């Protein structure tokens, strides 16, 4: 419970820093695969704390005025159409990533429209490939008992590029003075190219998106690193999309690379913001 409260204070502190720079925060809370597909859990059920994580984070965001659409409700409506998550992995499929990107784009268009002319992007499907996900790596069967492993998923990768240029033509823009209106920060849900979440966001938003997402770091560390970057200080975006899987809320991040005084100040600012939000209710 103490890690949940500390992480919520950090989230509120991040919001305060973004507000100071005129950046709108869109919190994309990714529901756990087990929450979306409880019918496959069998007799094992999550504990009480895990059962309430998604709603706790969503309610905290709403209480503090953070834009955070209910992605769980949207995905529950979509799950009958196609697989939203890989069978052998905790991550989403390219289709699931696309549906989330489209829902986020509708939220942006309704609540925080982007400035400037929209850009056009196109997404193409690449050749399918077998994919054994991270859930399989938890099973100590390979190589001696590999015949007992479940069959791999058939992943259909997608690639998105701007219609203004060919997919590989980025050399001219590399040294151009371009301010990206949208920044994406998050985890492997955003960073891994197999899901094409970044590309799906670009197409759905009609805007280029600069990604600072990282795999294997959780959602908090990439965000804190971005807040300390020259890119944020010198050229803050109009909108920042923070992809945040619910399962990280109770986890204690390793903050040893950051100045403890800075972290303490972020959490203090977050606590103050929470008190103000509570008084306003």
Model-predicted segments: where are they?
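Extracellular glycan-modifying ectodomains
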Residues: 1-281
């Amino acid at each position: 419970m103490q890690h949940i409260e500390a992480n919520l204070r950090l989230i509120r502190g991040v919001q305060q820093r973004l507000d100071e720079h005129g950046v709108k925060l869109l919190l994309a809370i990714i529901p756990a695969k087990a929450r979306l597909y409880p019918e496959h859990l069998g007799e094992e059920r999550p504990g009480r704390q895990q059962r309430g994580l998604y709603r706790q984070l969503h309610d905290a965001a709403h209480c503090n005025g953070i834009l955070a659409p209910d992605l769980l409700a949207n995905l529950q409506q979509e799950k009958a159409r196609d697989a939203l998550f890989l069978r052998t992995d905790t991550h989403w499929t390219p289709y699931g990533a696309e549906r989330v990107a489209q829902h986020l784009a509708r939220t942006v268009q309704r609540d925080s429209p982007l400035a400037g002319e929209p850009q056009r992007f196109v997404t193409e499907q690449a050749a399918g490939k077998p994919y054994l996900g991270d859930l399989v790596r938890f099973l100590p069967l390979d190589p001696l008992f590999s015949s007992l492993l479940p069959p791999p998923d058939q992943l259909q990768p997608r690639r998105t590029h701007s219609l203004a240029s060919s997919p590989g033509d980025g050399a001219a823009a590399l040294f151009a003075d371009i301010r990206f209106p949208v920044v994406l920060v998050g985890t492997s849900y955003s960073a891994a190219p197999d899901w094409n979440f970044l590309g799906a966001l670009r197409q759905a938003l009609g805007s280029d998106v600069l990604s600072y997402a990282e795999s294997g770091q959780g959602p908090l560390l990439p965000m804190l690193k971005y807040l300390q970057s020259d890119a944020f200080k010198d050229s803050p975006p109009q909108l920042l999309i923070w992809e945040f899987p619910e399962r990280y809320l109770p986890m204690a991040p390793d903050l040893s690379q950051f100045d403890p005084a800075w972290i303490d100040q972020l959490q203090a600012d977050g606590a103050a913001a929470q008190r103000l939000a509570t008084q306003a209710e």
